[in-house]
A protein has these predicted regions:
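CBM-like, beta-strand-rich accessory domains located in the C-terminal region of large
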Residues: 2-181
Length: 181
């Protein structure tokens, strides 16, 4: 027999954790609800050695002046440069999540705009134009353990939460991810 209560919990999780900004490594702006909208992508380079592309997600956040993300990668690292601008008269708290794909806790160190996150499989370095708080939380996963009920919906992975300390009219954040050696 199907446990309808458990199924309702799974449906709620889809709508609150998986299909929202919480479930993705993207921008969240406190007080703004993102919407589905075109996000033009410019590919500067894409080949066997890596790539370089820029996504303009501004239209996805009504009320935001700009969100531009540049992503560059090769075999050694992934570099993500986020440029976010709010209207001068409406500064905002900006937040990013980085899903690490591990159930192991991360070691977080740093202050102000410079932070480092280390976990068994890699490192994440943050350099920001504004002060940040960096924390971690456990979130359910349905990517690493796709669809495996015994180790899927209830599998929790580590998610790093990067948040501006206070409302800002703009923030530039560079995130560099490297695999452990």
């Amino acid at each position: 027999a199907r446990d309808w209560g458990a199924m309702a919990d799974e449906v709620r999780a889809i709508h609150t954790l998986y299909s929202t900004v919480v479930g993705h490594n993207v921008l969240e702006v406190e007080g703004l609800k993102p919407k589905k909208a075109p996000a033009p992508m410019t590919v500067s380079r894409l080949d066997a050695s890596g790539g370089d592309l820029t996504v303009d997600g501004t239209a996805c956040y009504p009320g935001l002046k700009q969100w531009r993300r540049r992503v560059r990668w090769d075999q050694s690292q992934l570099v993500v440069e986020d440029q976010v601008a709010a209207p001068a008269d409406k500064p905002a708290v900006m937040l990013f999540r980085w899903h690490l794909g591990t159930d192991q806790s991360a070691k977080i160190s740093g202050e102000g705009g410079n932070w480092q996150v280390v976990w068994p499989e890699g490192t994440l370095a943050l350099a920001s134009s504004v002060p940040l708080t960096v924390t971690q939380e456990k979130l359910p996963d349905n990517t690493v353990c796709l669809g495996k009920k015994d180790n899927g919906w209830d599998f929790l992975h580590t998610c790093v939460v990067v948040r501006t300390v206070q409302s800002a009219s703009s923030a530039d954040l560079t995130t560099t991810v490297r695999a452990a050696r």
